[in-house]
Design a protein with these regions (language model features):
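Solvent-exposed interaction patches of small proteins and small membrane subunits
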Residues: 1-91
């Protein structure tokens, strides 16, 4: 991955999602109510969505801009469209 994102910011978000996943595993091991587990699953889903947004924003701000400035507009836009399509399928 190019240096198009703030790795430290992304790492913090990823660690938060990992913590939430570990909490889900613990809840399952402790037979927590399904409703509470689902709340945590939704929190992880939201965290992963925010991670994806950070990556997309960085890609747009840096990689797409650089590609267009370098004269590779068509390929750059096609790559961004593909990335956006993949991200939108995650929800």
């Amino acid at each position: 991955m190019h240096k198009c994102i703030d790795s430290d910011k992304l790492r913090v978000r990823i660690n938060k999602a990992i913590g939430q996943l570990n909490a889900i595993q613990k809840m399952i091991d402790e037979n927590a109510p399904c409703e509470q587990v689902l709340v945590q699953i939704n929190a992880v889903k939201g965290a992963m969505h925010r991670i994806g947004l950070i990556i997309l924003q960085g890609h747009l701000s840096h990689c797409v801009r650089e590609g267009i400035e370098a004269g590779d507009a068509e390929e750059t836009i096609a790559n961004f469209s593909e990335a956006l399509e993949r991200f939108s399928r995650l929800s």
